Amino acid sequence: MVTIELMRAISAAFNSRDVERIVACFAEEATFCLARGPEPVGRTLKGKSAIRQALSDRFRQIPDMRWENEEYILAGDRAISVWTVRGQGGDGEELNYQGCDIYRFQGDKIIHKNTFWKIVEHKARL
């Protein structure tokens, strides 16, 4: 059963930007679906090695990336984290998105993480 303490520990790991600390939250063969990518689910990372590489790349591009968690919803071996992510990319672009992660756990390890975020459009497209 997922607890609020476990979710706060995962959030603290992500906000530390310590890749090994974050990867330790995942099961060995976990999947992590990023919000952006070439697939309908974004981009699927499979296993700790792929997750480690993607996070290393992300924090290199956005070294001050941080999440402000606003709400956790817990249900058995699943959880949802609602957040705002902020930071500044190497190109100077400000990151400020609202989103959520849907988690599935085995014990206290993440076996699946699916990330969603709002798309900010600066031009009217309607």
Could you say what each language-model-derived stretch is?
Residues 19-21, 27-70, 74-76:
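A solvent-exposed, acidic/Ser-Thr-rich amphipathic alpha-helical stretch
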Residues 15-17, 34, 103, 117:
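Generic helix-packing signal
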Residues 4, 10, 28, 36-37, ...:
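Aromatic-enriched hydrophobic runs in primary sequence
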